[in-house]
Structures are given as C-alpha cells and as structure tokens.
C-alpha cells in the first residue's frame, strides 16, 4: 500500500513552517517531508515530530545557495569539500530526526566546466555520500527533476539517472522516482515503474 507524507515545504504556506507539523497531523498524515531542515535547530524539529507523532520521511542534503538559484552542488567541480561537509550535516540532522531517507539534488549543469569533469565530479560525490550514509544506516536516494520547472537541472530522466547509479555501484542507493517530474520529461510512467520498481524509492 502507498504511504503518503505531507510535504511541509509545499503545503500550508499561509502559516509559519513550525506550525505545519500540527496541521499535517490534524489532516491525518503520519509522516512529513520538506526540502531542508537546516534553518532550524535539530532539537526543535525533533520535538515537533514527537509532539505530533510524525515520522520524518525524507529531507534533502544541503543544496548550496538556494536563494541564489542553486539547486544542488553534487555535479559542480571545485566544490567537493563543500559537498562532503553537506553530507555530514545531512547525516547529523537525519540521526536527530529519525529521517527515513536522504535525497541528493545533483544541481544545475555548470556551463563553464567540461562535461566529462562534471560527470566525474557527480560520480565521485555520490560514491562518497553513499558510503557515508551506509555507515550511518540511512537510506540514500537521488532524484531527477524536470527541466521545465528547473531549466538546466543535471539529472532529468530515468535512463540517465539509473546509468549514474549503476556507475556509482552502491547497493543501497536508489532512484527517488517523482511521478510529477518524470511525466513531464518522458511520460510512459507505468511501464517505467514496473521495469525499475526494485530500484525506486
């Protein structure tokens, strides 16, 4: 059976973020997700989850300067150290919140770097993250995003994303298959899901 978590980034935007946990519980949800927890102390978020008997289903690794338009840094050469630090921060929050999975946003394809270098950087960063998350016992997922909503997003379809995960070679890295994004990019959802269900979270 499907399990649904309320996305607190998208829902109830008319009220303060910290008040959305109560809204989710009142609406019958038992799990929540949101883009990033890092603007709030871990302890404060953990208290909200416990008070309203909610599970933290997912959050993303830090994704660079979101307000400035960045959408992840995993594919950006020269920022490997920052990415590694972001993995540590993501794990610290996930442990405090009991997060069931961490997602990595690859980022926008940099226009000033050779394609081969961009690819090498992404693979190396995902290998690092997969190893660290495995040690922490936290499931790891990678998401493809449609390029209509986010032009230039590096991972944007099923075949490309699964090929990247194959190259990373970790047994416990999965594809966060977002039906909304993949319908825009490629359609044919049911056969794609059936063919790849073992690799989808």
Where are these regions (language model features)?
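Histidine/acidic-residue-rich catalytic or RNA/ligand-binding cores of hydrolases
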Residues: 185-194
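Active-site acidic/histidine proton-transfer and metal-coordination neighborhood
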Residues: 73-174, 184
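Active-site-proximal loop/turn and secondary-structure-junction residues that shape catalytic pockets
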Residues: 10-12, 38, 62-63, 106-110, ...
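His/Asp/Glu-enriched short active-site or ligand-binding loop at hydrolase and phosphoryl-transfer sites
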Residues: 174, 200-201
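Hydrophobic residues within beta-strands of alpha/beta enzymes
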Residues: 32-33, 102, 140, 201
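N-terminal pre-domain/capping segments
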Residues: 1-95, 99, 162, 166, ...
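Hydrophobic residues in well-ordered beta-strands that form the structural core
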Residues: 56-58, 142, 177
């Amino acid at each position: 059976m499907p399990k649904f978590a309320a996305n607190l980034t998208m829902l109830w935007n008319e009220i303060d973020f910290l008040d959305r946990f109560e809204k989710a519980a009142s609406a019958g949800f038992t799990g929540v997700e949101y883009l990033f927890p890092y603007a709030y102390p871990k302890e404060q978020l953990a208290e909200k989850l416990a008070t309203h008997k909610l599970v933290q289903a997912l959050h993303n690794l830090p994704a660079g300067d979101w307000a400035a338009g960045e959408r992840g840094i995993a594919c950006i050469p020269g920022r490997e150290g920052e990415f590694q630090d972001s993995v540590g921060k993501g794990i610290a929050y996930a442990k405090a919140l009991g997060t069931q999975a961490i997602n990595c946003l690859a980022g926008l394809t940099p226009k000033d770097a050779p394609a081969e270098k961009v690819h090498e950087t992404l693979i190396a960063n995902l290998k690092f993250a997969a190893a660290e998350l495995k040690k922490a016992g936290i499931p790891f997922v990678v998401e493809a995003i449609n390029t209509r909503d986010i032009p230039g997003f590096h991972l944007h379809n099923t075949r490309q994303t699964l090929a990247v995960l194959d190259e990373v070679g970790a047994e416990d890295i999965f594809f966060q298959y977002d039906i909304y994004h993949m319908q825009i990019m490629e359609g044919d959802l049911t056969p794609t899901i059936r063919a790849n269900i073992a690799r989808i979270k």
